[in-house]
Amino acid sequence: MNQKHSEPFYISPRLFDNRRLKRRRCRWMERLLEHQRICMARMRDQVALASKTDRQLSHLQRRHVASTLQPDVTIDLLSDDDETPSAGQPAAAGHNRLLIPAPGHRAHRTGRRQAPRRAATHSYPVTDSILITSDDEHNEQEPSSTARVRSQLSMRSPPPLAPLTQSETIEEVTVSLVPRTSTTANCLTRVSGHPKPCRASTAASNGFATAEGGEGGNETGCFLEVDVGGGITATLPDETTVHTVIANRIYELSLSKLREGLAFSGVPEYTNDLMPEQLQKLSPALRAKVAPLVAPSPPTPISLKLSSDLSISLISDEDDCESTGPHVNGGVGTEPVHPVVVAAAEAHAAAKLLKQQQPQLSVVQHLQYVGGGLAAPVALALPVMAANPTSSASVVALPLQLPRRRKLG
């Protein structure tokens, strides 16, 4: 028997690559992974449910403890004139009991599902009181049955001006800024859009607490209340009023400090301590004899700037302080000196003397005056002591080198 053999062949490893078996194995692996993901998700849900149940139980315990507390808190309103409400024992002695929850011991669970047990609370006598101090001298004592605490933040009016003779008196200014989100216009818009008025929580988040209305229609929650003393309550329609009041207050303080320093330095115009209110009480004849407290205003407007350390700077609205005209570089005797210029020179010399005597008051005078019939402004800066006093004309002609300042407007 003649047996034929084929040509030699090679066994490829791909013969053992069963594709159907591989696909079947991949399907089983996918099902196993899906089942594992489902089991893990169920376990996570069970853990979250258990923690949520614990949180609910603790929340119920806290609510139960809070509901069992009795509102037995003493509030004493203390004023400057301490008037005892009763001649016997004080009011705080009768209300010295406050309930404090004791930590309840949680019982061990016997089964998986168990009804939430209510925590046991115990009360302990604890002496506790809240003291609220008031700066108002005319504090009306309300009866204890109708005593009602209002949570309101009021802006205190600044203290009055100190007299000119006491230079060591410390001036204190309380500045309260009104945010734009709590103005009357926004409150009115909010009221017109919604039936309920502005609540105290919305205003308190902006830095103010509105006063609660009294009965029915007396709703003043949309207006900002300002405590100006003496039981007078004013409403601020906008923050511009507050900024104006602050600016006027700073201006009055700076003027009083300037007058006080000039009077202390020995300027004859400022030695008398007559205030504008006292000048108004005088007759016109005596008022004409008394020298004015403030120098006459020059033709060029002067701005008054007050920094944080009460340093006063008189800044002209004109940008250039050095004049290039021939009147400054030339002789002084060519043109007649204007009386306002003479007054400015005296004021400048007084300011420099004040700077030497009281270094804590930083007075910088940077003025521009228009002389009589002069088109160009005259930059006037007279140093108190000249290095080489050879000629007074050179001293007057050379202006003082002051740091350039920007406009305030």
Swiss-Prot record:
Residues that span the membrane, as ranges: none
Ranges of Basic residues composition bias in the record: 106-120
Keyword Phosphoprotein (UniProt): yes
GO biological process, one term: embryonic development via the syncytial blastoderm
Compositional bias ranges of the Polar residues kind: 142-155
Superkingdom of this protein's organism: Eukaryota
Phosphoserine: modified positions: S86, S134
Keyword Phosphoprotein: yes
Residues the record lists as Phosphothreonine modifications: T133
Region of interest (Disordered), residue spans: 106-165
Sorted UniProt keywords: Phosphoprotein
Name of protein: Protein a6
Gene transcribed to yield this protein: a6
